[in-house]
């Protein structure tokens, strides 16, 4: 209890401080009101000029803190003149919390959009760009258009970044003082910027300050979904079809086991026997059958754990993922690890080729790159620990401008879903007769359509808002508060759009919100409730539950069922109990805790790839931005030569074997015959380096003489292609490592530590391979002067072909690996089986 009171005291103390600063802003109202429009714009110019003279971000932030009251007062006055709306004190307080890099939790209808204008204006003065982020492109478009009036009045520029825009249009949007965009588009633009070949092809500026609307949706709900840019991998789809046919034949408990709580599914011994007969293999779990078992497991997941119209939808022959938190489809997103292909096989649509990841990043890692990050939402307090631990953001609950009058009624619990839905329909019919508008919230598209059919049978006119008709979202939400309106909505419930009450609705009790099921996250339930009772309006909310709801099944509805049977309750009689409501909330807390742990675990694993990504992207960018890349090439030539000497030459031996070293030098650096055993015999490692280096330098100079001024362009092209090719393969290898690493825990090993160590080794090997390839292609490529190497356009993602190199004679050429005699996981096994080491003696 002490911990809770500390948090509450902390919030109260914070609110007092925000209130004092807000009063300073309000105190400047009269002084600002006498300024002309031109004088207001001149103030903006003055601030910008003073900030431009400060080159340090921290000092700029100190200056912004100093001018905050005056800047916020200017925005208030501008808002009054442009929109005829003056931000309230609580909105100023929310704006101050955002400027501090925190999350302002503000109830629905409290004017978050207007609140954000103050910190956006203030931080845009620094000239480093402010990103205002919304959950969809519709909201970005609407808000940028509306708010541009205010920002332009104040003397700032506004850009809108959409998926459909060209590279030039995107660059222009990012160059403005303020840029509106979705989180997805920002992430993809960042990845694309790190795949270009020339600096002028980039569209973004360095990441400075971001304000995220519906911050919980983006930083919590979508945190586990990585953004991926991929190219097609060549792979047959026939195994998906076979696995799908097999999965259809299986029976639960006999052939496979399914755990409802963890949503995991696996074959029984009997199921494995059937698989061996069906796929004509002797031992299903033999390493050579890893593809077969992988496809079977994926097909089982597609059939058993994922439901059509709940987890995904099929639209025009295409499988679209449904976002579990918003109810919207996510075009362009695909399940990974072959799961999407397994669903396509299940639904009988065309199976797309598997894709190969070329670049990826999670929102957790993308947003942590900003100098300052802030957000706003109606529901964030339940996830405060996660915001603090992962993003270093505090959640500040901003008071409402008017007291909340909504009546949140106790949950009603029924034995069956039929009893629950019958009661829901009766409640809707009763309220509809009185003219009170009703918003029905559902967890899945399937449920919204089922209730819609029940209401049609009763002759109740209504609108359905789900992933199938999201185009009319704004129109449906706008009418949801009118007299007699009945609206069914999935979780999306029109986030970002207010439901305003029509004439005479206040007298009828305001908007009635009915939840047909509890979501696994309390925030989503709070969001649904929050649709009603905006800005002090009247309203009420109630959730109808059944013991057959997924959340209840997952967390022990058997005890409740027995209790209701003992009480002799039938299907039409609900129980209304604080104990049950507490049990439901406890189940939700457990799920939230599990989800937080999962996101934290993902971040720990992703941290390994984040550091590696940072090194690769920095390397790429320095190659692109440097006018001369010869220093990079020189360093690579030297380190590759030194590594090969360390690996092959053992001067302690009485009779060292020089031929493998010479073969390697011929393969990577020189033409055959350029170096002989006589050149290096009897010399120590240092002298050998000098002898060979002189020959390499001469070969390098020869290429420079042939290509002259085109040499730099040629080197850049080779460097970037080599980095991109190996980095893409490395991402794939790291993904494979991660998929199987959890099994290490059964051998009393620490999977995370193993992943970190092996990931580091794989990265070292990749860097060596990049250097080796670069050396080989720069020294051994045969380029004619008349080839006229042109600047290479950034090609379609996924394609990167090397300049053809002279191969010389066919022979076995060993590669130097720094780790002594250790063999890499993806190298051929030394036993000569032809398998990769990880699938043979490396198991």
UniProtKB/Swiss-Prot annotation:
Disulfide links within the chain: none
Cofactor(s) the record lists: Zn(2+)
PROSITE patterns the record matches: SECA (PS01312), SECA_MOTOR_DEAD (PS51196)
Cofactor: binding details: May bind 1 zinc ion per subunit.
GO cellular component: cell envelope Sec protein transport complex; cytosol; plasma membrane
Keywords for this protein: ATP-binding, Cell membrane, Cytoplasm, Membrane, Metal-binding, Nucleotide-binding, Protein transport, Translocase, Translocation, Transport, Zinc
Gene3D superfamilies: Helical scaffold and wing domains of SecA (1.10.3060.10), P-loop containing nucleotide triphosphate hydrolases (3.40.50.300), SecA, preprotein cross-linking domain (3.90.1440.10)
Top-tier EC class: translocase
Residues holding Zn(2+): 829, 831, 840-841
Molecular-function annotations in GO: ATP binding; metal ion binding; protein-exporting ATPase activity
Topological type in the membrane: Peripheral membrane protein
Pfam families on file: P-loop_SecA, SEC-C, SecA_DEAD, SecA_PP_bind, SecA_SW
UniProt subcellular location: Cell membrane; Cytoplasm
Reaction catalysed by this enzyme: ATP + H2O + cellular proteinSide 1 = ADP + phosphate + cellular proteinSide 2
Keyword Protein transport attached: yes
Oligomeric form and interacting partners: Monomer and homodimer. Part of the essential Sec protein translocation apparatus which comprises SecA, SecYEG and auxiliary proteins SecDF. Other proteins may also be involved.
Protein name (record): Protein translocase subunit SecA 1
Organism encoding this protein: Staphylococcus aureus (strain MRSA252)
């Amino acid at each position: 209890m002490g911990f809770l009171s500390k948090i509450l005291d902390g919030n109260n103390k914070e609110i007092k401080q925000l209130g004092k600063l807000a009063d300073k802003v309000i105190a400047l109202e009269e002084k600002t009101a006498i300024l002309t429009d031109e004088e207001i714009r001149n103030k903006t110019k003055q601030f910008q000029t003073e900030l431009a003279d400060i080159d340090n971000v921290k000092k700029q932030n100190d200056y912004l803190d100093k001018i905050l009251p005056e800047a916020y007062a200017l925005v208030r006055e501008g808002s009054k003149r442009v929109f005829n709306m003056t931000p309230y004190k609580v909105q100023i307080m929310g704006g101050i919390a955002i400027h501090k890099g925190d999350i302002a939790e503000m109830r629905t209808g409290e004017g978050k959009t207007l609140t954000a204008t103050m910190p956006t204006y203030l931080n845009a003065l620094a000239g480093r760009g402010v990103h205002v982020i919304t959950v969809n492109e519709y909201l970005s478009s609407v808000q940028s258009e509306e708010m541009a009036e205010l920002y332009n009045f104040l003397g700032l520029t506004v850009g809108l970044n959409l998926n459909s825009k060209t590279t030039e249009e995107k660059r222009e949007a990012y160059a403005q003082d303020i840029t509106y965009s979705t989180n997805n588009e920002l992430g993809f633009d960042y990845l694309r910027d790190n795949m270009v070949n020339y600096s002028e092809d980039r569209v973004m500026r360095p990441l400075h300050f971001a304000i995220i609307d519906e911050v919980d949706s983006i930083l919590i709900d979508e945190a586990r979904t990585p953004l991926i840019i991929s190219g097609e991998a060549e792979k047959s789809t026939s195994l998906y079809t076979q696995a799908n046919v097999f999965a259809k034949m299986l029976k639960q408990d006999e052939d496979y086991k399914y755990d409802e709580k963890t949503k995991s599914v696996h074959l029984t011994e009997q199921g494995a026997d059937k698989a061996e007969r069906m796929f004509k293999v002797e031992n299903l779990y033999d390493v050579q059958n890893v593809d077969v078992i992988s496809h079977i497991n994926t097909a089982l997941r597609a059939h058993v754990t994922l439901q059509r119209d709940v987890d995904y939808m099929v639209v025009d022959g295409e499988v679209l993922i449904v976002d579990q938190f918003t109810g919207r489809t996510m075009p362009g997103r695909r399940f990974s690890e072959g799961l999407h292909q397994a669903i396509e096989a299940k639904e009988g649509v065309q199976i797309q080729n598997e894709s190969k990841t070329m670049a990826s990043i999670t929102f957790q890692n993308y947003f942590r790159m900003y100098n300052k990050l802030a957000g706003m939402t109606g529901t964030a307090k339940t996830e405060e620990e996660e915001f603090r631990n992962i993003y270093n953001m505090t959640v500040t609950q901003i008071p409402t401008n008017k007291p909340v009058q909504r009546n949140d009624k106790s949950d009603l619990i029924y034995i069956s879903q039929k009893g629950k839905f019958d009661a829901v329909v009766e409640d809707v019919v009763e309220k509809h007769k009185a003219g009170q508008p009703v918003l029905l919230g559902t967890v899945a598209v399937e449920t919204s359509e089922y209730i819609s059919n029940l209401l049609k049978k009763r002759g109740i006119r209504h609108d359905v808002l789900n992933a199938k008709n999201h185009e009319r979202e704004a129109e449906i939400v706008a009418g949801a508060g009118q007299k007699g309106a009945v609206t069914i909505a999935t979780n999306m419930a029109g986030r970002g759009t207010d439901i305003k009450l029509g004439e005479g609705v206040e007298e009828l009790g305001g908007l009635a919100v009915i939840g047909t099921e509890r979501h696994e996250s309390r925030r989503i339930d709070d969001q649904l409730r929050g649709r009603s009772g905006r800005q002090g309006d009247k309203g009420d909310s109630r959730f109808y539950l059944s013991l057959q709801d997924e959340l209840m099944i997952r967390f022990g509805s058997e005890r409740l069922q027995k209790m209701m049977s003992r009480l002799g309750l039938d299907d039409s009689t609900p129980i209304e109990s604080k104990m049950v409501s507490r049990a439901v909330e406890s189940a939700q807390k457990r799920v939230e805790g599990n989800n937080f742990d999962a996101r934290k675990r993902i971040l720990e694993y992703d941290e390994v790839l984040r550091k590696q990504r940072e090194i690769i992207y920095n390397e790429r960018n320095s190659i692109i931005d440097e006018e001369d890349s010869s220093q990079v090439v020189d360093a690579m030539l030297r380190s590759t030569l030194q590594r090969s000497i360390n690996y092959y030459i053992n001067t302690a031996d009485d009779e060292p074997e020089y031929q493998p070293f010479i073969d390697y030098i011929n393969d990577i650096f020189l033409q055959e015959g350029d170096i002989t055993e006589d050149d290096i015999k009897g010399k120590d490692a240092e002298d050998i380096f000098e002898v060979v280096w002189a020959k390499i330098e001469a070969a390098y100079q020869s290429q420079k003489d042939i290509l002259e001024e085109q040499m730099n362009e040629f080197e850049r092209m080779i460097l970037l292609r080599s980095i991109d090719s190996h980095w893409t393969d490395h991402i794939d290898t790291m993904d494979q490592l991660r998929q199987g690493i959890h099994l290490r825990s059964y051998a009393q090993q620490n999977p995370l530590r193993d992943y970190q160590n092996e990931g580091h080794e794989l990265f070292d090997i990749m860097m060596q391979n990049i250097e080796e390839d670069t050396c080989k292609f720069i020294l051994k490529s045969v380029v004619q002067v008349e080839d006229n190497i042109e600047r290479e356009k950034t090609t379609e993602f996924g394609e990167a072909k090397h300049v053809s190199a002279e191969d010389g004679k066919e022979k076995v050429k060993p590669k130097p690996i720094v780790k002594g005699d250790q063999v890499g996981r993806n190298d051929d096994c030394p036993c000569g089986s032809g398998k990769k080491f990880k699938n043979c003696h490396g198991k």
